[in-house]
């Protein structure tokens, strides 16, 4: 059993290296961060590998079996986001790379940022793949219809736990920039793998990110860095 968990850790690190989330020089650091989150005091490198996101699911299974988390959708999401945070580049690294690529081409920069948002599992590709989408002709022209199935139904246990959880008021909402790196609660999603790009709008600091639910292709969000009512 424990060897399969070591293999899952190795596989997650391999995935992070292959898609450019993690530099090989950071592998030991990131491995130790993962072992800490899993409360593992030992480790042996394994030769077998597990595909992503299966390796992440195995690590959540292990945490549930060890009593570290409850085996519910919300708690698994909180935990696997913590794990992905261990292999996601720091915000400053992402910002530097984005603007470096932007000097070459704005498209290169946004393509990089969108891919990173998927690779770090902020946009969960496996769930987005479940969405239904088609077009139909109407008298007004071609209409695109989509059914969002990627946002999972809430587990009754999570609903009950959320009712007992007192709201902290921080972050003030799901779109506040203070969500970057936030550990989350049973009623507020974890965001250790969220990265927000600083942009300037009318001389004011705003943030640019991609939506995790992809209601349409490359669904982007630009929000004020100050919590203000949407009008």
Segments from the language model and where they lie:
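Active-site microenvironments that recognize anionic phosphate/pyrophosphate groups
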Residues: 1-230
């Amino acid at each position: 059993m424990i060897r399969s968990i070591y293999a899952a850790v190795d596989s997650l690190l391999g995935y992070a290296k292959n898609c450019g989330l993690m530099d090989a020089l950071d592998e030991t650091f990131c491995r130790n961060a993962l072992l800490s989150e899993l409360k593992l005091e030992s480790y042996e490198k394994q030769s077998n590998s597990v595909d992503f996101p299966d390796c992440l699911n195995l690590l959540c299974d292990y945490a549930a079996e060890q009593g570290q988390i409850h085996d519910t959708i919300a708690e698994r999401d909180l935990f696997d986001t913590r794990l992905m945070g261990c292999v996601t580049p720091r915000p400053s690294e992402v910002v530097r790379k984005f603007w470096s690529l932007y000097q070459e081409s704005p498209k290169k920069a946004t393509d990089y940022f969108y891919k990173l948002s998927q690779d770090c599992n902020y946009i969960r590709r496996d769930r987005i793949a479940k969405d239904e989408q088609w077009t139909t002709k109407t008298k007004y022209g071609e209409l695109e219809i989509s059914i969002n199935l990627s946002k999972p139904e809430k587990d009754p246990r999570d609903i009950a736990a959320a009712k007992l959880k007192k709201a902290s008021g921080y972050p003030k909402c799901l779109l506040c920039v203070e969500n970057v790196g936030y550990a989350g609660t049973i009623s507020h999603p974890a965001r250790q793998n969220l990265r927000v790009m600083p942009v300037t709008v009318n001389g004011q600091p705003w943030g640019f990110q991609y939506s995790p639910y992809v209601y349409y292709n490359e669904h982007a969000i630009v929000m004020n860095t100050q919590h203000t009512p949407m009008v």
